[in-house]
Amino acid sequence: MTTLAQYLNTNAASPALNDVITTVTDVGKTISQLLRKGALADILGEAGNQNVQGEDQKKLDVLANDLLLDALAKNTHCAGVASEELDDAIPANAEGSLLVLFDPLDGSSNIDINMAVGTIFSILPYQHQGKVSENSDFLQAGNQQLAAGYLLYGTSTVLALTITDNVVMFSLDPDTNDYVLIEENVTVDADTSEYAINASNYRYWRAPMQQYIDELIAGEIGVRGRDFNTRWVAAMVGDVHRILCRGGLFTYPFDTKYANKAGKLRLMYEANPMSLLIERAGGGATDAVNRILDIEPTDIHQRVPVVLGSKNEVDYVKNLHLNYAEK
């Protein structure tokens, strides 16, 4: 039985990376405990304010964010922290060598109905040790990530992590409070018959995405010649976890629902870390035209369309968009 601590000691590229991942996952234990208490800990309901994204914050959004910020500020290897919940990145320790980005509680609308939520994190190198970090230091393409992962708080608490060229999974043992390795080489099947999308936005999508979903709905009587099933957790972390476990496709495509927003999902806090996990498990991740991990960010809260999961299906969606652009 291999614990997370043992795995990191053997596989982490540096003691600094080991320590920062440990800090994040230790906070995950606290968040997991709070979620188990639910209403008994008075953590349900609205916090009464909005985040930088214009979204209403839940009480646990704020609490999870504060727990991560406080813990990382005390970590000497962390030079700065950027959160989906805050306007700007926060400097930590100028001598640190790492930057941490996170979505403290993805899918927080699920909290009050006792459904899956999670914490997503990304770790980048810091290039200016000795100087106070600022927003621009975080503007690195996803292919520069040193580590990425998520904690899924469901019927059990699961950690998915990549620090090498593969993806591993751990489960939090409630008896020992240790993360225990349960899968050491996660792979995503190239083909799938499951897809996840919020179909209520159909009228706002571009024509190739509408065509794609029309084909899936037509199933065996359409051009695809086989049936597909829809799955939707309303939390990216839950949908991506399902894909890592049994394949599938997840997309939150470009839409015109809100002006000046290319998509719903944030590049730095959601798309980049999830894309790294999916690609290293053998899947694909694109904005429907470009590889997500190659996108050069211009803002820490930049939004992008996302299509990720089983590679053959991702490639199919990308080809539909490319063919449409050539017409």
Swiss-Prot record:
Annotated Mg(2+) 1 binding sites: 84, 103, 105
Pathway: Carbohydrate biosynthesis; gluconeogenesis
Matches recorded under InterPro entries: FBPase_C_dom, FBPase_class-1, FBPase_N, FBPtase
Family annotation (Gene3D superfamilies): 3.40.190.80, Fructose-1,6-Bisphosphatase, subunit A, domain 1 (3.30.540.10)
Cell compartment(s), UniProt: Cytoplasm
UniProt: substrate binding residues: 106-109, 198, 264
Lineage top rank: taxon: Bacteria
E.C. number(s) listed in UniProt: 3.1.3.11
Enzyme superclass (EC): hydrolase
Cofactor: Mg(2+)
Record-linked CDD domains: FBPase (cd00354)
Annotated GO CC locations: cytosol
UniProt remark on cofactor binding: Binds 2 magnesium ions per subunit.
GO MF term list: fructose 1,6-bisphosphate 1-phosphatase activity; magnesium ion binding
Assembly notes: Homotetramer.
Family to which this protein belongs: Belongs to the FBPase class 1 family.
The protein, known as: Fructose-1,6-bisphosphatase class 1
Native source organism of the sequence: Psychrobacter arcticus (strain DSM 17307 / VKM B-2377 / 273-4)
